[in-house]
């Protein structure tokens, strides 16, 4: 994978695909690396938009193939990290497409670097101005508690030796509602399939990055609310599309509805029964979501 050095930050892994005059930056969610887009989203985007757009995927510092993160989490800083990457790659103006945390980073990029954003789309959209943000993000306390039980692994990158331990402790309780040791045999089989499906999207991420991000969600995510409150209403001339599944329990659809009220030019499309991560891994959920984005992008030509 290509890697570029960003002064004062470290190294960032990235990948180009597609062809065309425009550039769409795919911004990852949570602690997933850029392969998060490969299973379902990227094939649809390439098929529908190739010849019109190139796609830039990248790993945040601390994630995937990038170097370890040494600075505290801050969404505006992550937007600046993307700006630095674009500068290093000699890319000027872009279309932003972020999922989950990637939507927050995209929103921050709009605020800080409006002149470089041609359009914005978010899938599963955290709203840091929501009065229901704290109870929504409280789920990360359980995940952080689980990580505290494996502190000896924090300095490591996720690899095949530690992967099952991390996922079984952190994500299995969130998905199945109980500890891995309490799963039935069929549930353990489902957990195994899930681990195999998402390993490539988590490989290389520092476990310390997971710890720091979950702490940020619990204690620091609202610190930048002032910048969002002041900046987002000024984005009236930026084409925007907000996508959200009605079955999304991580970034509930009410957050996208609230953002749509704040951003009257944004179009909100809700997908019945679609979950938070379903579009990234399940073809049935991915197809309507990403085809709708392609329709939006054809309107930007």
Where do the language-model regions lie?
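Conserved hydrolase catalytic core segment
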Residues: 92-135
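Active-site loop/oxyanion-hole signature of alpha/beta-hydrolase fold enzymes
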Residues: 57-97
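Acidic catalytic loop of the alpha/beta-hydrolase fold
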Residues: 247-251
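Conserved alpha/beta-hydrolase catalytic His-Asp/Glu region
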Residues: 157-216, 221-226, 231-234
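Conserved HGGG/HGGXW glycine-rich cap/lid loop of the alpha/beta-hydrolase fold
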Residues: 10-67
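Flexible "cap/lid" loop of the alpha/beta hydrolase fold
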Residues: 120-159
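Catalytic histidine-centered segment of alpha/beta-hydrolase-like enzymes
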Residues: 274-287
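Short beta-strand/loop motif that positions the catalytic acidic residue
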Residues: 235-236, 242-244
């Amino acid at each position: 994978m290509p890697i570029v050095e960003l002064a004062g930050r470290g190294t960032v892994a990235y990948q180009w695909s597609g062809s065309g005059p425009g550039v769409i930056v795919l911004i990852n969610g949570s602690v997933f690396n850029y392969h998060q887009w490969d299973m379902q989203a990227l094939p649809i985007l390439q098929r529908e938009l190739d010849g019109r757009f190139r796609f830039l995927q990248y790993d945040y510092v601390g994630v995937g193939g990038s170097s370890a993160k040494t600075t505290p989490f801050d969404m505006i800083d992550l937007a600046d990290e993307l700006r630095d990457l674009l500068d290093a790659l000699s890319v000027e103006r872009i279309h932003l497409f972020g999922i989950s945390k990637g939507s927050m980073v995209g929103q921050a990029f709009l605020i800080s670097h409006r002149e470089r954003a041609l359009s914005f789309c978010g899938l599963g959209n955290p709203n840091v101005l929501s009065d229901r943000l704290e109870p929504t993000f409280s789920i990360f306390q359980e995940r952080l508690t689980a990580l505290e039980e494996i502190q000896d692994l924090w300095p490591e990158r996720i690899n095949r030796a530690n992967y099952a331990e991390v996922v079984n402790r952190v994500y299995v309780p969130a998905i199945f509602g109980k500890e891995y040791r309490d799963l039935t045999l069929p549930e353990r089989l489902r957990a195994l399939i899930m681990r195999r499906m998402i390993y490539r999207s988590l490989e290389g991420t520092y476990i310390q990055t997971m710890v720091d991000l979950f702490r940020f969600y619990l204690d620091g995510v609202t610190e930048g609310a002032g910048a969002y409150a002041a900046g987002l209403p000024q984005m009236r001339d930026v084409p925007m599309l907000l996508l959200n599944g009605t079955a999304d329990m991580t970034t509930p659809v009410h957050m996208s509805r609230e953002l749509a009220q704040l951003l009257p030019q944004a179009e909100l499309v809700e997908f019945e029964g679609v979950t938070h991560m379903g579009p990234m891994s399940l073809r049935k959920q991915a197809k309507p979501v990403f085809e709708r984005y392609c329709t939006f992008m054809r309107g930007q030509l």
